């Protein structure tokens, strides 16, 4: 018998706030965290804007030595995980460490480490690379560092599915608790690749918006959309088996009730044109949760602001919900914080949980003229306030990776 899984802790580092409270205040206020790139000189780059994390000081979240052994994606992950763990009120002295684990992903890891050490090889020779180059670079170190910092000795893994990584991590952590492998899981995603090779690579792929006005660059579902804006940060949650959470008197934010994951088997970057793969992920999540399409109140879309994603995700929602798609509110958090790649699903799951808590669906900022081919309710022009019972979050990754989480208002 599957065990029920609830959300008991939230953590976030984002372009509009480095804690959940700061982030959610920014979301409610419609704050846009996109601006000129400050990390390097962009004079020769077509793309000059991104959604950078601002004012983050790693040593405020860990000791100096630990911080020096982590690249930004790992630092963001540890900071968000510590916030979520503290929020959940878990005392590891009272827990079996082998029943508490971590599944946190990063789509890329550290391109910065690759850049720095390749320059050393070219200029000074291979003997001059940082001895810690490999552990600084590899994407599993977000999960590894969280495990070390929090003393979690259970399942510790890393899912890499590009822009769906964070959502798959939360889904797989959900499964670990459902089937009895763990009682507590720290899950989500982290990313930081606003650097020369990251921006150049995505620009060459024609994936990024070349608009220089930060308010008009990430405009999901708008007829003038022309690409996504690169973002960074981390979104981490604590998932817990229901009876375990109740036994220790935990505050329960919401219940995670369904998870769907599919593959398009179609193209290395483009989602399937009929939306069937992403639509099936939503259907599977609803089926597991025992929820009908007409019960879905809100969908936090992948909504990247690229032509193909927004059009095909609209088709996917229609495939999954049928006639009920016309009544659901859809939005995109990427309109405010850009695309956090492997961290996107984690941060957007936090948005879904907070939306249920507050009965608040944020506006899709910047979007003013909805593409006629995207014909759903995208929360354009104003936020929506309504009681939310069932909410879905979608993530779609390069390679055809589709993932959907269904979270519901907690009831005994």
Label each residue range with its predicted role.
Residues 123-130, 168-171, 175, 191-247, ...:
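Glycine-/small-residue-rich "gating" segment that lines the acyl/pantetheine channel
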Residues 77-88, 142, 169, 240-242, ...:
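Short, well-ordered amphipathic alpha-helical segments that serve as non-catalytic structural scaffolds
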Residues 181-226, 259-273, 303-310, 327-377:
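Acyl-CoA/ACP chain-elongation machinery
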Residues 1-66, 243-253, 350-364, 408-412:
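ACP-dependent fatty acid/polyketide chain-elongation machinery
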Residues 77-90, 139-143, 147-191, 229-250, ...:
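Active-site-proximal alpha-helical scaffold in enzymes
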Residues 84-96, 245-252, 282-298, 320-324:
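Phosphate/pyrophosphate-binding loops at sites that engage ATP/ADP/AMP, CoA/4′-phosphopantetheine
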Residues 7, 28-161, 190-199, 295-311, ...:
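Conserved beta-ketoacyl condensing-enzyme motif
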Residues 4-8, 35, 213-289, 298, ...:
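Condensing-enzyme catalytic core mediating Claisen C-C bond formation in acyl metabolism
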